[in-house]
């Protein structure tokens, strides 16, 4: 028996006779795991053998009881060196297992605990009746039994259930006999009742026919039974049961249709005790419609049987009856005009702290009849735009505010400083110990002080104080002071007077003096004694300013650092002396390093400008009163995030003062300085602070309840007294007192969601406070912070009396709301930046290019299109957007890069003419590059100008150029041309940073910002939070409940970010604070760009947003141009070799079998994925227009699958005629004869997936018009299936880039492969890639098998794509070389004849910096050894070893020290 185990046995007083048994001879504690949050200790024991059952139970009971006394939960398991599988011992432990969770569930225990077990053939055999030998018990309970028996010491057992026929027959016989007896008795009872009834009835004159069975009556009775049935809480269901009735809310619904046409509704419900999975079957569409009430958010009553789902292995209700019910909702029952206004409410934009969306918060207030509601998120205003729009819609006033983190600009080292020599005057070093942090609710229990002169103690003071009550365990644990120390101690007032006499005429010194002085002054005030007036030095702030590089400035860390003795930290006498020793060191360093000799110098010469970073944060609520205040609010939020961010956004008090116009201030919650002063310094101090604010906040006692657990307030009566004190503060400071709710969620049952979110932050988070210290620390409870009605708030404050409660809850909050003016948070118009002569420049550039291409005068069709577009662009102030985009594209072009367009900008011919996009939206046409003669095909017979046959100009004989994709302008700026243009551009990823800087250069640093985003908790992340909460707090949730909790916790703000390419430009005649605050992304104060504080979507119709995205295509094109010298603009879009790729592999010189695919699409942008390759195989495109169709079909939602694909397969339509891109609908319908406006409207309805959502009357109007113009029914039906459509201009830009890349694959293959591997490939495996065809194909086969088994990793999936291209390259006769230490580039692949040489970065684990360092080092000289490669090249030992294994290093020695014997050989 180990000493540690023996000690444990002593502590639990294990009987000696049991300890002396052979099983205990080598007993030991293998491990103890301590979970401090959940206060759970896990013991892992080792024994010589499985314990006798009586010994085990004794050990178990004594461990539990002993640790329970210390509020600690215990579990333990046993590893036995020898296992006895005798029947008696095994049976005893088998039955014992059912006394331990989770084996003790009622259903499992009742069905299994009395069964017999045996051990045969290395298996535990359970003989069970047939009716319990089922999947439910096998899957859900037997694994728990295995774990429990393992914990007993039996190791991991294999359990097998066998059906005991004899037992089954016996139980069945008993059941049948019992049932027959019951039936017999029931029949007898019925006969006797019938006889009695007949005796009472009059004689029957003639026989009447027997009544027919009434099915309707039976159904009615069944329905009546359903209506009156007892509702079972979901938490109580643990096993299969019949005819169970639930009531709850549906939170998830999925409808499926089987191959046989039956429908399944899988849904999940919660009654907030737990959640459940349910299933309802419907035989056909008609029956399915009867259950439309099964919808997300609906409240239902359901009845059905609980069964184990064979697929999910979880309990599921098979629903038999369902009925929609009305949920009892909380309502504000106060009369109109007597309802409160909530002035402190958080939305899900309060980072990791609150749940409701601002819309749900406002909707609830409006539903309750409140006239206004305030939004006060923590340190941000990101919910303002949505709140602004929702409040206007709901007809309620939104009060825009925030809960700010206020700090003092400079935290003083000295209070009340005077002209004194720090090195010559006497100092009184003091410290106090208290029963808590509240001077009003806790007591002084020790005051100690030491008088020091020049570092020497000359006199000491040390007195304990009797608080009049026993000390709490927490106080004793923290201070080391026990009730024994306080026996015979003097009364408080006596000690206070003596201490004042002791400290007279001394400089007072304390560590964290603000607390000590505040506590002392509160006690002096209470006993009518004079407050502290002499100078005070705070050594905490002294250390922070003198040693800012230190991370911790507490007394303990400082004494360790300076080797000052501190034997009993948190006992006042020891702390006071240690503080004195530290002060002497501080004074010496301050004099030597900063020349500080006088007390007055501490605050003036030593306090750092950034001392606000260490200042204690105090909360305050700030509200926008008017439009001036809104702009000031935006400035404050910006400054707090940009200039004063330290852990959290901070607002120094002087900064707040400078921007206070138009703002109103409240004292906030228990973390506000007025509340803190009431607790720690007294009412007088609180009144002085309260004068700074516009009103005093008080909150429901339930909000302050956690302060009782934290021992800051004694009890409920103490909370009520604090609230009365705050009201008194307001009265004396002449400030109104308002009751606010500190709302963090809407409904009481949503508390658990916030609990999960907050606990996920870990113990280090400020909001996730703990009680206690060290391993015994427990999470402090969170307040009940739901949105309260007026009635609920009045009930909370009933202790104040009816009139005063009404005043603070209703009257004062209404009065405050009346002081708030309506403000415009989001502008109603677009404000574009000003560029001198933008309108003239756009028009001039347009006509200049148009004349160059089409001649002067212009063809009518061109002239009319330009006039139409310029009227819209110039008339709506969009010229500057066009010109800015043109300038950016032109700069990138000058740096040698093409820029691809995205979205619908290619629908604008003006954009084409000024060089923003290559896509020409005019109808297909010819134009002569010499004489500008042109021909336009306007009847819709040609889909793309690139598909026109080649022909010469009839006027001059020069070969015509071909262009035009037939895209209407309306798809870009709307039918009326007034939609704000969204110009998205694809810059090369290499050039994107330069393009971003171009925006700054054009518009100015102070006007260009990255488009901000808000990152919220995703449901998958929330799922992890729920599982973590289960683990840490000993919870067990069924799967449906986990899903419900995860959904409830999702959507909360977690961080901020930036759009990958979006840049917002503020007009130079305004400033950014007219639109939004600004910040750094993800609170990274080192970021080179500031972002908009608002999500850019919230202001994208008010300011210019440029989408400057990075893309591989322009980078790839630039690489190919550099390799070949070919200008990509000259590459024809109708090259026959390129088009041949879409129909076979012959043009590549390989067979489909060699490369594993029937076409040459591998590695071609837009067309290389498995999905699109499959579409190509089915449709066989031969023209550019058909490629546009494919691009549209592959990017749309429900456009190809279940729609166009079926139409083509069935021969109803062709690739050319199906609906592919959104613009095709408008063009097709206009060609069919519909009015342009209706054609446009139909296109908009279809492309947004609204066709089936609009009214039947509107839809039928469109259908009638289409049929009148001979639009086929299949086309109309296809419209109804579409959810989203791709713009044709986007497709055209992408396809054009793709064909340019494909051109090189066909005609300059080695260059293509070099560019592909340098830019597009995501994963490499050089050993395989340079190992030849067999190695490549073998690895591909390996990954294919893994994919089939769903075992392939993401890296392997990316590698497979790379290997497909490697395989193709090798099959075409090219070679993949090995990494070469002296030839390989750092980043780019190199071409050596018909061979590609990989770069260093392609080696797994070798990053860009090391790759560049190796190249630089080899230029300085040859690597003579592996050691030198590591040293000069920066390669790790692992990388060098990997290079050696691949044969890259040849015979390179380990080091370049020659052996003594090398000279002889």
Swiss-Prot record:
It comes from the Bacteria. InterPro entries: DNA_pol3_alpha_NTPase_dom, DNA_pol3_finger, DNA_PolC-like_N_II, DNA_PolC-type_N_I, DnaE2/DnaE/PolC, DNAPol_HHH, DnaQ, Exonuclease_RNaseT/DNA_pol3. It comes from Streptococcus pyogenes. It is an enzyme of class 2 (transferase). Required for replicative DNA synthesis. This DNA polymerase also exhibits 3' to 5' exonuclease activity. The keyword Iron does not apply. GO terms for biological process: DNA-templated DNA replication. Residues 431-583 form the Exonuclease domain. GO terms for molecular function: 3'-5' exonuclease activity; DNA binding; DNA-directed DNA polymerase activity. The lineage of its organism: Bacteria, Bacillati, Bacillota, Bacilli, Lactobacillales. Belongs to the DNA polymerase type-C family. PolC subfamily. GO terms for cellular component: cytoplasm. This is DNA polymerase III PolC-type. Its EC number is 2.7.7.7. It is found in: Cytoplasm. Keywords: Cytoplasm, DNA replication, DNA-directed DNA polymerase, Exonuclease, Hydrolase, Nuclease, Nucleotidyltransferase, Transferase. It catalyses: DNA(n) + a 2'-deoxyribonucleoside 5'-triphosphate = DNA(n+1) + diphosphate.
């Amino acid at each position: 028996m180990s000493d540690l185990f023996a000690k444990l046995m002593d502590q639990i007083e294990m009987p000696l006779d049991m300890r002396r048994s052979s099983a205990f001879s080598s007993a030991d504690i293998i491990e103890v795991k301590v979970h401090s949050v959940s206060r759970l200790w896990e013991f892992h024991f080792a024994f010589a053998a499985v314990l006798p059952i009586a010994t085990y139970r004794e050990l178990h009971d004594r461990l539990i009881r002993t640790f329970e006394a210390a509020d600690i939960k215990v579990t333990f398991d046993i590893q036995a060196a020898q296992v006895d599988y005798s029947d008696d011992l095994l049976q005893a432990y088998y039955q014992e297992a059912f006394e331990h969770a989770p084996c003790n569930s009622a259903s499992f225990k009742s069905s299994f605990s009395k069964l017999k077990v045996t051990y045969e053939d290395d298996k535990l055999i359970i003989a069970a009746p047939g009716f319990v030998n089922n999947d439910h018990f096998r899957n859900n309970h037997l694994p728990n039994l295995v774990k429990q028996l393992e914990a007993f010491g039996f190791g991991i057992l294999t359990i097998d259930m066998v059906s005991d026929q004899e037992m089954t027959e016996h139980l069945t016989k008993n059941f049948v006999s019992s049932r027959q007896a019951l039936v017999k008795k029931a029949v007898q009872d019925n006969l006797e009742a019938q006889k009695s009834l007949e005796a009472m009835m009059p004689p029957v004159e003639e026989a009447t026919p027997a009544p027919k069975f009434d099915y309707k009556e039976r159904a009615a009775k069944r329905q009546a039974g359903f209506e009156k049935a007892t509702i079972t809480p979901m938490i109580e269901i643990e096993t299969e049961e019949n005819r169970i009735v639930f009531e709850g809310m549906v939170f998830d619904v999925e409808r499926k249709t089987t191959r046989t046409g039956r429908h399944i509704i899988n849904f999940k419900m919660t009654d907030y005790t737990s959640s459940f999975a349910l299933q309802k079957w419907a035989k056909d569409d008609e029956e399915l419609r009867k259950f439309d009430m099964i919808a997300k958010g609906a409240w239902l009553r359901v009845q059905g049987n609980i069964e184990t789902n064979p697929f999910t292995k979880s309990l599921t209700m098979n629903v038999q009856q369902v009925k929609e019910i009305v949920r009892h909702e909380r309502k504000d029952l106060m009369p109109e005009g007597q309802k409160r206004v909530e002035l402190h409410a958080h939305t899900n934009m309060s980072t990791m702290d609150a749940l409701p969306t601002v819309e749900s918060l406002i909707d609830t207030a409006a539903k309750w009849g409140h006239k206004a509601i305030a939004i006060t998120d923590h340190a941000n205003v990101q919910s303002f735009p949505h709140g602004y729009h929702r409040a206007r819609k709901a007809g309620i006033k939104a009060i825009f505010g925030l809960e700010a983190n206020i700090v003092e600009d400079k935290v003083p080292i000295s209070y009340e400083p005077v002209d004194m020599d720090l090195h010559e005057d006497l100092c009184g070093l003091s410290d106090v110990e208290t029963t808590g942090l509240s001077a009003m609710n806790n007591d002084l229990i020790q005051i100690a002080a030491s008088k020091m002169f020049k570092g020497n103690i000359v006199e000491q003071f040390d007195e304990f104080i009797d608080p009049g009550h026993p000390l709490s365990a927490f106080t004793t644990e923290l201070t080391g002071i026990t009730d024994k120390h306080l026996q015979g101690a003097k009364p408080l007032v006596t000690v206070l007077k003596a201490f004042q006499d002791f400290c007279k005429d001394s400089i007072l010194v304390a560590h964290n003096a603000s607390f000590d002085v505040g506590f002392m002054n509160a006690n002096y005030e209470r006993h009518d004694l004079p407050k502290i007036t002499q100078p005070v030095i705070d050594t905490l702030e002294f250390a922070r300013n003198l040693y800012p590089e230190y991370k911790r400035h507490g007394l303990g860390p400082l004494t360790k650092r300076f080797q000052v003795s501190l034997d009993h930290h948190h006992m006042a006498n020891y702390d006071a002396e240690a503080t004195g020793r530290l002060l002497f060191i501080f004074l010496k360093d301050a004099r030597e390093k900063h020349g500080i000799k006088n007390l007055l110098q501490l605050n003036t010469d030593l306090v750092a400008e950034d001392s606000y970073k260490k200042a204690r944060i105090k909360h305050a609520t700030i509200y926008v009163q008017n439009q001036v205040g809104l702009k000031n609010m935006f400035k404050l939020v910006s400054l707090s995030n940009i200039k004063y961010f330290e852990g959290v956004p901070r607002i120094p008090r002087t900064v707040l003062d400078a921007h206070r116009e138009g703002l109103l201030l409240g004292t906030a919650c228990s973390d506000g300085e007025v509340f803190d002063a009431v607790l720690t310094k007294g009412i007088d101090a609180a009144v002085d602070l309260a004068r700074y604010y516009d009103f005093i906040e008080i909150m429901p006692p339930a909000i302050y309840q956690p302060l009782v657990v934290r021992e800051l307030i004694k009890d409920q009566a103490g909370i009520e007294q604090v609230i009365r004190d705050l009201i008194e503060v307001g009265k004396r400071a002449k400030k109104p007192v308002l009751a606010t709710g500190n709302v963090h969620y809407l409904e009481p049952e949503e508390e658990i969601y916030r609990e999960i979110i907050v606990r996920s932050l870990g113990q280090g988070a400020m909001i996730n406070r703990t009680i206690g210290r060290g391993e015994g620390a427990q999470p402090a409870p969170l307040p009940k912070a739901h949105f309260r009605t007026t009635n609920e708030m009045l009930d909370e404050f009933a202790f104040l009396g009816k009139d005063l409660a009404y005043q603070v809850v209703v009257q004062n909050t209404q009065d405050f709301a009346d002081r708030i003016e309506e403000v415009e948070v989001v502008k109603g118009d677009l404000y574009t930046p000003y560029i001198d002569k933008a309108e003239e420049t756009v028009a001039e550039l347009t006509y200049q290019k148009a004349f160059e291409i089409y001649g002067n005068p212009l063809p009518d069709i061109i002239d009319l299109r330009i006039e139409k577009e310029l009227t819209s662009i110039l008339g709506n102030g969009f010229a500057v957007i066009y010109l800015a985009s043109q300038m950016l594209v032109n700069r990138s072009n000058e740096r040698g890069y093409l820029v691809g367009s995205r979205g619908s900008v290619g629908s604008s011919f003006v954009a084409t003419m000024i060089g923003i996009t290559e896509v020409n939206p005019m109808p297909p046409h010819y134009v002569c590059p010499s004489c500008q003669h042109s021909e336009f095909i306007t009847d819709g017979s040609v889909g793309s100008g690139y598909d026109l046959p080649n022909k010469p100009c009839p006027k001059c004989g020069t070969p015509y150029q071909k262009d035009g994709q037939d895209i209407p302008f309306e798809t870009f700026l709307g039918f009326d041309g007034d939609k704000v243009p969204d110009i998205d551009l694809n810059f090369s990823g290499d050039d994107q940073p330069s393009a971003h800087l171009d925006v700054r250069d054009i518009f100015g640093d102070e006007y260009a910002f990255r488009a901000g985003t808000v990152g919220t908790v995703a449901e998958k992340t929330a799922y992890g939070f729920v599982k973590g909460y289960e683990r840490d707090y000993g919870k067990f949730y069924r799967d449906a409940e986990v899903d419900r909790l995860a959904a409830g916790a999702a959507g909360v703000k977690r961080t901020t970010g930036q759009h990958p390419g979006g840049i917002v430009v503020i007009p130079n005649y305004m400033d950014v604070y007219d639109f939004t605050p600004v910040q750094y992304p993800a609170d990274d104060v080192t970021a080179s760009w500031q972002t908009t504080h608002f999500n850019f979507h919230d202001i994208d119709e008010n300011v210019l947003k440029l989408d400057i995205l990075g893309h591989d295509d322009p980078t790839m094109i630039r690489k190919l141009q550099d390799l070949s010298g070919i200008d990509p603009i000259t590459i024809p879009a109708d090259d026959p070799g390129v088009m041949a790729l879409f129909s076979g592999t012959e043009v590549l010189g390989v067979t489909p079998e060699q490369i594993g695919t029937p076409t040459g699409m591998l590695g071609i942008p837009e067309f290389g994925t498995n999905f699109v390759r499959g579409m190509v195989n089915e449709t066989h495109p031969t023209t550019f227009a058909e490629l546009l169709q494919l691009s549209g079909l592959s990017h749309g939602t429900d456009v190809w699958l279940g729609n166009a694909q079926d139409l083509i397969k069935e021969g109803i339509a062709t690739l050319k005629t199906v609906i592919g891109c959104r613009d095709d609908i408008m063009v097709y319908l206009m060609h069919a004869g519909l009015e342009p406006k209706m054609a446009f409207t139909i296109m908009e309805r279809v492309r947004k997936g609204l066709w089936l959502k609009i009214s039947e009357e509107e839809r039928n109007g469109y259908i009638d018009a289409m049929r009148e113009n001979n639009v086929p029914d299949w086309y109309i039906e296809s419209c109804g299936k579409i959810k989203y459509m791709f713009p044709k201009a986007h497709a055209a830009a992408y396809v054009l880039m793709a064909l340019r890349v494909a051109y090189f694959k066909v005609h300059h293959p080695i260059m293509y492969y070099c560019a592909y591997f340098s830019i597009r490939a995501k994963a490499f495996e050089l050993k395989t890639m340079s190992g030849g065809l067999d190695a490549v194909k073998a690895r591909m086969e390996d990954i294919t098998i893994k994919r089939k088994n769903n075992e392939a990793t993401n890296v392997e999936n990316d590698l497979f794509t790379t290997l497909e291209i490697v395989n193709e390259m090798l099959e075409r006769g090219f070679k993949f070389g090995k990494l070469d230490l002296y030839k390989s580039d750092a980043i780019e692949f190199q071409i050596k004849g018909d061979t590609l040489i990989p770069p260093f970065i392609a080696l797994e684990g070798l990053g860009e910096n090391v790759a560049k360092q190796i190249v630089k080092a080899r230029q300085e000289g040859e690597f003579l050894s592996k050691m030198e490669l590591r040293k000069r090249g920066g390669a790790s030992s692992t990388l060098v070893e990997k290079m050696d294994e691949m044969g890259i290093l040849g015979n390179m020695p380990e080091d370049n020290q020659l052996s003594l014997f090398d000279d002889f050989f």
